[in-house]
C-alpha cells in the first residue's frame, strides 16, 4: 500500500509543527495548510488520504470547509479542535467528518485513531470495487458509473460523487429492495460504527436525493423506512 498522505489544516504554527513531527515520525507524508485556499491548492495538486483540520481558521472556518471538502473530494476527514461542546461535535459529524478529537490531545491516541481511519478508508471496498464484473448500474434514466465513481444524468451530465455518497449508492444498487439500516450504511460508507447522534447517513442520503429525486421531501428512488433505515426502490436495468 502507498504511503498515506496527510494534510494538516491548522493556522497555529506551534500546533501545526507538532502535528507534522508526530505524523512524520510515524512514516506518513505530511502536507500543511493554514487556511481554506491553501487546503484546496494542495488537494488539487496531491492525492491526499486524510485531512486533519481545526475549526477555528482564518477566513472560512473548518465547518464551512468541511462542507466544500465533502462536495469536491474523496478524502477522510478528522476534526482536531479546541471546540469541545456537543453542538459543534454533532454538527461536524453531520457534515461528514469521520472523526472528531478535541484539544489538548494525546499524541498516541491521535496517531492510533488516524491510523485506524486510514486503514478503513484506504482499504474499504478497494478490492470489491475494482474487481466487479459490472461497470455501471442504470436506473430511472440515471447511471452509476463505477470506474469514474460518478452519477450520469438523463441529459448526459456527470456528477462526481464524494466517497461516502458513492459507496452508499453502490451498496443500494447491489441490494435493491432491501432495507438498509443506518448502522450498515455507515459501515459501508466510512468503516465507522454508528454512535448516538451521528447523522452522517441521513445527511449523505439527503445530498444523494438532490441529484435524482424530483421532490426530495417525498422520495421515490431512495425511500425512508421509519425506524429501520432506507431502501433503494429504483428500477434497475438488467
Swiss-Prot record:
One of its GO terms (molecular function) is DNA-binding transcription repressor activity. The keyword Repressor applies. It is found in: Cytoplasm. Phosphorylated by ArcB. SUPFAM superfamilies: C-terminal effector domain of the bipartite response regulators, CheY-like. Pfam families: Response_reg, Trans_reg_C. Keywords: Activator, Cytoplasm, DNA-binding, Phosphoprotein, Repressor, Transcription, Transcription regulation, Two-component regulatory system. GO terms for biological process: negative regulation of DNA-templated transcription; phosphorelay signal transduction system; positive regulation of DNA-templated transcription; regulation of DNA-templated transcription. It comes from the Bacteria. InterPro entries: CheY-like_superfamily, OmpR/PhoB-type_DNA-bd, Sig_transdc_resp-reg_C-effctor, Sig_transdc_resp-reg_receiver, WalR-like, WH-like_DNA-bd_sf. The keyword Iron does not apply. The modification 4-aspartylphosphate is found at residue 54. One of its GO terms (cellular component) is cytosol. Residues 5-118 form the Response regulatory domain. Residues 134-234 bind DNA. Its main location: cytoplasm. Member of the two-component regulatory system ArcB/ArcA. Represses a wide variety of aerobic enzymes under anaerobic conditions. Controls the resistance of E.coli to dyes; required for expression of the alkaline phosphatase and sex factor F genes; it may also be involved in the osmoregulation of envelope proteins. When activated by ArcB, it negatively regulates the expression of genes of aerobic function. Activates the transcription of the plfB operon by binding to its promoter. This is Aerobic respiration control protein ArcA. It comes from Escherichia coli (strain K12). The lineage of its organism: Bacteria, Pseudomonadati, Pseudomonadota, Gammaproteobacteria, Enterobacterales. The gene is arcA.
Amino acid at each position: 500500500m502507498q504511503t498515506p498522505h496527510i494534510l494538516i489544516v491548522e493556522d497555529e504554527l506551534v500546533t501545526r509543527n507538532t502535528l507534522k513531527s508526530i505524523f512524520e515520525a510515524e512514516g506518513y507524508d505530511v502536507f500543511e495548510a493554514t487556511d481554506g485556499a491553501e487546503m484546496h491548492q494542495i488537494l488539487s495538486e496531491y492525492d491526499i488520504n486524510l485531512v486533519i483540520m481545526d475549526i477555528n481558521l482564518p477566513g472560512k472556518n473548518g465547518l464551512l470547509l468541511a462542507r466544500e471538502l465533502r462536495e469536491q473530494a474523496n478524502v477522510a476527514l478528522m476534526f482536531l479542535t479546541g471546540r469541545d461542546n456537543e453542538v459543534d461535535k454533532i454538527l461536524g459529524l453531520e457534515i461528514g467528518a469521520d472523526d472528531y478529537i478535541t484539544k489538548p490531545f494525546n499524541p498516541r491516541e491521535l496517531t492510533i485513531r488516524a491510523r485506524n481511519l486510514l486503514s478503513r478508508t484506504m482499504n474499504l471496498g478497494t478490492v470489491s470495487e475494482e474487481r466487479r464484473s459490472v461497470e455501471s448500474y442504470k436506473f430511472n434514466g440515471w447511471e452509476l458509473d463505477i470506474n469514474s465513481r460518478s452519477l450520469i444524468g438523463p441529459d448526459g451530465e456527470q456528477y462526481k460523487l464524494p466517497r461516502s455518497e458513492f459507496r452508499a449508492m453502490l451498496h443500494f444498487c447491489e441490494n435493491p429492495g432491501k432495507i438498509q439500516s443506518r448502522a450498515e450504511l455507515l459501515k459501508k460508507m466510512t468503516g465507522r460504527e454508528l454512535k448516538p447522534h451521528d447523522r452522517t447517513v441521513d445527511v449523505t442520503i439527503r445530498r444523494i436525493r438532490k441529484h435524482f429525486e424530483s421532490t426530495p421531501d417525498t422520495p421515490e428512488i431512495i425511500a425512508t423506512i421509519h425506524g429501520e433505515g432506507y431502501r433503494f426502490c429504483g428500477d434497475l436495468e438488467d
